[in-house]
Swiss-Prot record:
GO terms for molecular function: actin binding; ATP binding; calmodulin binding; cytoskeletal motor activity; hydrolase activity. The keyword Zinc does not apply. One of its GO terms (cellular component) is plant-type vacuole. ATP binds at residues 154-161, 207-215. Residues 1199-1224 have a biased composition (Polar residues). Residues 1179-1191 have a biased composition (Low complexity). SMART domains: IQ, MYSc. This is Myosin-16. PROSITE patterns: IQ, MYOSIN_MOTOR, SH3_LIKE.
Length: 1242
């Protein structure tokens, strides 16, 4: 291109930072040129390294880079950058789609409307899109019956996973069911993505959602194009990430989702913050920007429901995940024996217990499986202990094994739930596999990943380069050979058998004494002359491979351990014996012949899986999507030219562009071509032509040039197939239009007849419309007259309004002056109202003091009377008690004698005694009932007094707090407070009298300790304080009952006189009596004696009860005494509040005095209202007190009744009488103009 470059030419020149930069040639000297770049720098470069720039290229770039005028690296790079700035992230390169990761959401590119648009369009008819690739693959599968596959490739973080999900979503939309049928296959296929992402994706340095496994989704379709089944294959899960995480990467997403689960799940699994788990806190990254782990956890559970994983299985899955976290927190220390280990501390023991509980296995068996190994020899089985380091390695190995088995179970469960269609003959495969990786530390996982990418690149080379060019040679067509870089040598270096790296690794794993150093030495010796293998300096175990994408240095320290595909026997036996069927299912018993089988390795198994994948890809027709990562910062709108150019070179995109432009991207066999495009030349059907001639006829008829006719195929240039499809669509459209024309003719004739029939009706309607228009004009004219009339009236009304407004303004001024005068008069009225209030307060206080003196005198007299009466009653009770005791002793003695002599009693005396005894019992019962009623009445009265006392005290406090109301309501509040105060003091005095009387009665009752009669008398005395009249009646009744009981006893005693005087003569008298004594009389007397004894016992019991009640009454008196003291304290507070109120009134009298002396007041009124303040109040003990809501501060006087002695009631009455006549008038005028009056006042 150097001959096309001259001075002032626009060229692309290499730049160390931006890869390529445009500029203008200033001067050319020999083979070098001086260029002025667009950033102002002068650069000198060789002409062979300069590329011309297309200055006429579209500003928005081109959709297919095969249409670029200059096809070279800087042009391709500039076109991608231009479209990326416009958010056009998709660009074609022939049939290859290049997708640049936007690192931001672009929902407008993937909604249902866009999918519908691409569903109806042909390939390249619309803008480049991932949906277009899915659409062409689907149409070719349906139309041609060929199986298709779409290979999504690119570096880590280039957007392969998201692109794959969009493809699957579009294919599900294209081949989905029209109606909702529950969990359809397409829904299950789509919802399998979030499940596998949760357990197989993790954050890496280059990507926040990097797939740590390979995935090939095979979507099956039925004969009508609907999805009928699917299968998912996974490759090489990165097991080491479970135990080892580099900063700032993260472990698998599922661990963080489970830590953010709902509280009930976290509590059930005993989880917490991710920082508390060793497998997660190795990195400082716990959160992802824009990702809510709690919401993602619920979304994953919903996706599991759709896929077909039951609730029980979901719980088991997350229980296993939680057990891995607890397993990682188990630490070991040295045991008692040498080279042995044990659980380190209590915390580690807790995590061991939780792990065994979650896995449902024995904790001691788990500890033995981690800390010991069984060695089987021909002679015996030896149990060997592991040191702490060996136990930690065993722990990590168990965690990796459990997670790997869990992931395999998930994939298998998804495949079983979705199901495969064994009768399907059409399928589309979508491959999403890890991209090329090169980190600071590259281990066995990176080796396998890059090996996979080498195989895919080889497949890409074979398809795009070898297969294309080989096809050209086979068909013997003219073409220009394109050189390309082949990576077959590096693939052979890795997989060739024998002698490849994988073969040597398997060989080293089978040797018991192999080490990473011996394995590396073997590699150095075997591949020392290989151009793709290099030995780094200063290392003994590292080696470097020259991949198609760049050089990668691998550390082989863990290659041997990671390549071994086996499970520790102790771990297998432990988990196979788990009580959880899910866990035991992950570790089924091994077949007996497995121990005798050949050695198996991860590398060999992965190589076999990869070969099967290549066979599947080779059996289908591929479509390629190359994903490109624009920058390593993972930020939107940042396009790193050097990074993108490296990906384009390593991905073979530039070479593919050259091949596609120089070659023929589309080819079809003659039969396929004629079956599809024969309708473009129908005359061929009339003759017998060979297939080759017929194909050439069609192409020449449509004016296509540049095509090639091979031996069995037609080779078309880029875009010619789309042109032929457009002609075919046009022919089909013309045929359809002819058919539609005949139908439309018939429909048009029918429509004409209807229109002619309708025209008559239209004309009639039109004439009616004209008449209506004339009528409308007439109505409009009439309306115009009305409008004019209303307008004139409005003008006149406006003039009238102005005149009225002027009059109102004048009247307002006059009324304002009158209102001011009226307001001044209202101030005078208000002052008089305040004076009246204070006068009423003074009168109330005077009345209160008089009532208080009278009440004290009455109380004193009442207490004296009660005390004298109680003294007399006490003496009388003592005398009665002594008499009662003597009579009861004598009665008891006579009753005993009467028992011996009872058979001589006459029937008449027995009847009288029985009647007397009944009356006595009746009187005793009535006396007891009276005593109980008296006690209950006294108790109720005491409770009422207590409630009244509390209510009065509360009213006193409320009256004290209410003193701070506004000045307009002070006179009402003052009257209420005075009334409450008087009521409170009366209640206090009454309560005091009650408590005093009760205390005296309790002391008398305690000294006497009387039985039934004295207890009743004491109850009567207690109730006398509240109900004096009732008490007198009850006392008289009690005395009458007592007298009657004594008479009954005397009657009984008289009946026993004869027997008591001569006891020994009684027997002789009885013997002389000739009349027999009836047995009934003896039984009657005996019963009467027993009844008397029972009565005596009852009386004793009642005496005990009376003594107990006396003690209770004493306690009640003590409690009431305390309440009385509290009441007295509240009374003192109330008196203090009242004194403050009185002093506030005196201060406001002084202020009223100053107001009444103002010039606006009447002279006669002011002269008759002097208010004098007591000077002695200023020297009181209370210095100052202020109301809570008042604007005044005043000193508080001492609580004496002389504070208002200086007020002259006659003078206050003069003021009240003068103003009372005008009070009504002032009130009415105040309501008429309140606002203006206050403005003048202030």
């Amino acid at each position: 291109m150097a001959e096309n470059i001259m001075v002032d030419s626009h060229v692309w020149v290499e730049d160390p930072e931006r890869a390529w930069i445009d500029g203008v040639v200033l001067n050319i000297k020999g083979e070098e040129a001086e260029i002025k770049t667009n950033d102002g720098r002068d650069v000198i470069a060789n002409l062979s390294r300069l590329y011309p720039k297309d200055t006429e290229a579209p500003s928005e770039g081109v959709e297919d880079m095969t249409r670029l005028s200059y096809l070279h690296e800087p042009a391709v790079l500039d076109n991608l950058a231009t479209r990326y700035e416009l958010n056009e992230i998709y660009t074609y390169t022939g049939n290859i789609l290049i997708a640049v990761n936007p690192f931001q959401g672009l929902p407008h590119l993937y909604d249902a409307e866009v999918m519908e648009k691409y569903k109806e369009a042909y390939f390249k008819e619309l803008n480049p899109h991932v949906f277009a690739i899915g659409g062409i693959a689907y149409r070719e599968m349906i139309n041609e019956g060929r199986n298709k596959c779409i290979l999504v490739s690119g570096e880590s973080g280039s957007g392969k996973t998201e692109t794959t999900k969009m493809l699957m979503r579009y294919l599900a939309y294209f081949g989905g069911h029209t109606a909702v049928e529950g969990r359809t296959v397409e829904n299950q296929v789509l919802e399998s993505n979030p499940v596998l992402e949760a357990f197989g994706n993790a954050k890496t340095v280059k990507n926040n959602n990097s797939s740590r496994f390979g995935k090939f989704v095979e979507i099956q379709f039925d004969d009508v194009g609907r999805i009928s089944g699917a299968a998912i294959r996974t490759y090489l899960l990165e097991r080491s990430r479970v135990c080892q995480v580099s900063d700032p990467e993260r472990n698998y997403h599922c661990f963080y989702l489970l830590c953010a689960a709902p509280p009930e799940d976290v509590e059930r699994f005993k989880l917490g913050d991710p920082k508390s788990f060793r497998y997660l806190n190795q990195s400082s990254c716990y959160k992802l920007d824009g990702v809510n782990d709690a919401e993602e956890y619920l979304a994953t559970r919903r996706a599991m429901d759709v896929v077909g994983i039951s609730e029980k299985e979901q719980d088991a899955i997350f229980r296993v995940v939680a057990s891995i976290l607890h397993l990682g927190n188990i630490e070991f220390s040295k045991g008692e024996d040498a080279d042995s280990s044990s659980v380190k501390d209590e915390q580690s023991m807790f995590h061991l217990q939780m792990t065994s509980e979650l896995l449902m296995c024995d904790p001691h068996s788990l500890e033995d499986a981690l800390c010991k190994r069984m060695m089987v020899t021909p002679e015996e089985v030896i149990k060997r202990s592991l040191d702490p380091l060996g136990a930690a390695v065993s722990r990590d190995g168990l965690a990796k094994t459990i997670y790997s088995r869990l992931f395999d179970w998930l994939v298998n469960k998804i495949n079983i739930s979705i199901g495969q269609d064994s009768h399907s003959r059409r399928l589309i495969g979508v491959l999403d596999i890890y991209g090329f990786e090169s980190f600071k530390t590259n281990s066995f996982e990176q080796f396998c990943i890059n090996y996979t990418n080498e195989k895919l690149q080889q497949h890409f080379n074979q398809h795009v380069f070898k297969m294309e060019q080989g096809e050209y040679q086979k068909e013997e067509i003219d073409w220009s050979y394109v050189e390309f870089v082949d990576n077959k040598d590096v693939v052979d270096l890795i997989e060739k058998k024998p002698g490849g790296i994988i073969a040597l690794l398997d060989e080293a794993c089978m040797l018991p004494k192999s080490t990473p150093e011996t394995f590396s030495e073997k590699l150095y010796h075997t591949f020392k002359d290989h151009k793709r293998f290099m030995k780094p300096k200063l290392t003994r175990s590292d080696f470097t491979l020259v991949h198609y994408a760049g050089d990668v240095q691998y550390q082989s320290d863990q290659f041997l351990d990671k390549n071994k595909d086996y499970v520790v026997a102790e771990h297998q036996d432990l988990l196979n014996a788990s009580k959880c069927s899910f866990v035991s299912g992950l570790f089924p018993p091994l077949p007996k012949e497995s121990s005798k089988s050949k050695f198996s390795s991860i590398g060999a198994r992965f190589k076999l899986q990869l070969q099967q994948l290549m066979e599947t890809l080779n059996s289908t027709e591929p479509h390629y999507i190359r994903c490109v990562k624009p920058n390593n910062l993972l930020q939107p709108t940042v396009f790193d030219n050097a990074n993108v150019l490296h990906q384009l070179r390593s991905g073979g995109v530039l070479e593919a562009i050259r091949v596609k432009c120089a070659g023929y991207p589309t080819n079809r066999t003659f039969i396929e071509f004629l079956n599809r495009f024969l309708i473009l030349a129908p005359e061929i059907l009339k003759g017998e032509y060979e297939a080759e001639v017929a194909c050439k006829w069609i192409l020449e008829k449509k004016g296509l040039t540049g095509y090639q006719i091979g031996k069995s195929k037609v080779f078309l240039r880029a875009g010619q197939m789309a042109e032929l499809d457009a002609h075919r669509t046009r022919v089909l459209g013309e045929s359809a239009r002819m058919i539609q024309g005949q139908v439309r003719t018939r429909l048009t004739r029918e429509r004409f007849v209807l229109m002619r029939r309708a025209s008559v009706n239209i004309q009639a309607n039109w004439r009616g419309n004209i008449a209506r228009k004339i009528s409308k004009e007439m109505r409009r004219e009439e309306a115009a007259i009305k409008i004019q009339k209303n307008l004139r009236r409005q003008i006149a009304k406006k003039d009238y309004g102005k005149t009225k407004s002027s009059a109102l303004t004048l009247q307002s001024g006059v009324r304002t002056m009158a209102a001011r005068h009226e307001f001044r008069y209202k101030l005078t009225t208000r002052a008089a109202t305040v004076i009246q209030a204070y006068w009423r307060g003074y009168s109330a206080i005077s009345d209160y003091k008089k009532l208080k003196r009278v009440s004290l005198l009455c109380k004193s007299n009442l207490r004296g009377r009660i005390a004298r009466k109680q003294l007399g009653q006490s003496k009388q009770a003592d005398r009665k008690e002594e008499t009662e005791k003597e009579r009861k002793v004598e009665l008891s003695n006579r009753a005993e004698e009467a028992v011996d002599m009872s058979f001589v009693l006459h029937s008449e005396q027995s009847d009288d005694a029985e009647s007397g005894h009944g009356r006595k019992a009746k009187l005793s019962i009535e006396s007891e009932d009276g005593l109980d009623k008296s006690s209950v009445l006294h108790s109720e009265q005491s409770d009422d007094e207590e409630l009244g006392h509390e209510r009065k005290t509360k009213l006193s406090i409320e009256s004290e707090d209410g003193h701070s109301d506004q000045s307009d309501d002070e006179e009402i509040e003052h009257e209420r407070k005075t009334k409450h105060c008087i009521q409170a003091e009366d209640g206090i005095e009454k309560s005091y009298v009650m408590h005093s009387d009760q205390s005296d009665d309790e002391e008398i009752g305690h000294k006497r300790k009387t039985k039934h009669s004295i207890q009743a008398e004491d109850g009567i005395e207690k109730s006398f304080v509240v109900h004096s009249d009732q008490s007198d009646d009850e006392e008289i009744g009690h005395e009458r009952k007592t007298k009657h009981a004594i008479q009954v006893e005397d009657g009984i005693q008289k009946s026993f006189v004869t027997c008591s005087e001569k006891p020994y003569n009684t027997f002789s008298v009885v013997s002389q009596i000739t009349s027999p004594i009836r047995d009934t009389e003896i039984e009657s007397l005996t019963a009467e004696v027993e009844m008397l004894k029972a009565l005596l016992q009852v009386e004793k019991q009642r005496a005990d009860i009376s003594e107990r009640k006396c003690a209770e009454a004493r306690e009640l008196g003590e409690r009431r005494r305390k309440r009385l003291e509290e009441t007295e304290r509240r009374v003192y507070q109330l008196q203090d509040s009242l004194n403050r109120l009185l002093y506030s009134m005196s201060d406001q009298f002084s202020q009223l005095k100053s107001i009444l002396r103002s010039p606006s007041m009447s002279a006669s009124t002011m002269a008759s209202a002097p208010v004098v303040r007591d000077d002695l109040a200023d020297s009181s003990e209370n210095s100052e007190a202020s109301s809570s809501d008042s604007d005044f501060t005043f000193p508080a006087p001492s609580p004496s009744s002389d504070n208002f002695s200086t007020f002259n009631p006659n003078q206050l009455q003069v003021i009240v009488q003068d103003l009372s006549t005008t009070e009504a008038k002032g009130t009415e005028s105040y309501d008429s103009d309140k606002e203006g009056g206050f403005e003048d006042y202030f």
